[in-house]
């Protein structure tokens, strides 16, 4: 979610999507929800009330300082797992879906072109799966891999293929065209895209980014774009027997991009 525009779209549309598509579990990445920079506790609670089961984040998680406080007490708020040991909050959790399934959600951040000093995301993923394996403690496993490099995201997907239900990338704000089920049954998409105004620069008002490209001199702050938002994401049908993906498709609803709703749920 990016800014007020993205929040409004999610809060208005998500309850209907849950009802119409019979969604058992919903994950929303909210790291840009507060004006494009971080998330407040109020926004977190509003997102949960709208129907999200878990909120994931990324490199902007601490942009709103209050997140350092409420992350300690909100079980359904995740920051990247591979932050240094002792960091406030947590990076993974086991949750109950509406159908009774036990869903492990983990938030991991990439290092390529981002934060090379973070703990290794592949070692982190292995640690998470060893502690809560698919088919044993968890009926489904979802990774939000928050990263810049598509190569790092897809390699992580291959690394956990057959051991996770879904690996979905976040961070670039642009939905990719590679939604697929990998060889051993893990659904994958390099980036889910954003819930925000696509008449923008990644959800931010386009004038200041454009000015900086042209003049190299900042004139003001980046501010979230305020036009009508498009909801972007991925929908996955997971086997009750194996915990692996049976179907996966992109989800886009809104005025700017071509709309698509998974045919297997329409």
PLM ranges: what are they?
Residues 1-266:
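Acidic, metal/ion-coordinating pockets
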